[in-house]
């Protein structure tokens, strides 16, 4: 098992290097000189060759590309993502509070997605082929097909504006989490519930389940055996939903005026504030790699057959 964990962790590093290099290249995605991009982003009215040369020297754009990447990566490893092109403030100071706000929303939403997916998946699998199963799958398919921004808008109009039950936007207290969490749960639970249902159906069709049924084992005991084996899906759901939700919160945070990474990154994109964009992309990508690896390790701990297959 120790070798398996080391192998999984070792595989993370080349992925992080590739992702970080692609993130670094965001500075060069425009056709113009990065120095010109910075000056335009700062609202400089008259971009002269002297200003371009001064900016190139200030930000190290005269160095070879790989040297620039090395310097940027070493700084990023110390959580120093440079300074904002717009405000001149350290990016870490802007990213820090926004990251914590997004992380709290993401964790709460991931827990709700996991609980909802497990409940719906288990009930649907136990009632497969019956009205309850068909109803759950139909509703899940319908809700998954609805755009998140539309669901968010409907909830704001009816719950916040007309009924005046919950705040429409911002982060003013615990009640501010309710509407965004509901929208995120609706968007993702319908997707993950199908994975839980499929796993449960596969487990219910296993030979050991048929044997236990034939032996007269009580339904509750049988369910405990099946749920124990199906828990791997729940682990994967929780681990994978965190980076996926965090990376997909841009629209939700914008609609609810949530002071998080999504809104900050959207503003940075509109302003061409590349250091902020780089920090956002790198954080989300690294979290995705880390939680994916964590899910593999936990699943291998729960299922020795996965370790055998990875050798």
From Swiss-Prot:
It is found in: Cell membrane. It holds the Pfam family BPD_transp_1_N. It is a multi-pass membrane protein. Induction: Up-regulated in metal-poor media. GO terms for cellular component: plasma membrane. One of its GO terms (biological process) is nickel cation transport. CDD domains: TM_PBP2. Disruption phenotype: Deletion of the cntABCDF genes decreases StP intracellular levels and decreases the import of iron, zinc, nickel and cobalt. Keywords: Cell membrane, Cobalt, Cobalt transport, Copper, Copper transport, Ion transport, Iron, Iron transport, Membrane, Nickel, Nickel transport, Transmembrane, Transmembrane helix, Transport, Zinc, Zinc transport. The keyword Protease does not apply. The chain crosses the membrane at residues 9-29, 105-125, 139-159, 173-193, 237-257, 274-294. The complex is composed of two ATP-binding proteins (CntD and CntF), two transmembrane proteins (CntB and CntC) and a solute-binding protein (CntA). Part of the ABC transporter complex CntABCDF (Opp1) involved in the uptake of metal in complex with the metallophore staphylopine (StP). May be involved in the import of a large array of divalent metals ions such as nickel, cobalt, zinc, copper and iron. Probably responsible for the translocation of the substrate across the membrane. Belongs to the binding-protein-dependent transport system permease family. This is Metal-staphylopine import system permease protein CntB.
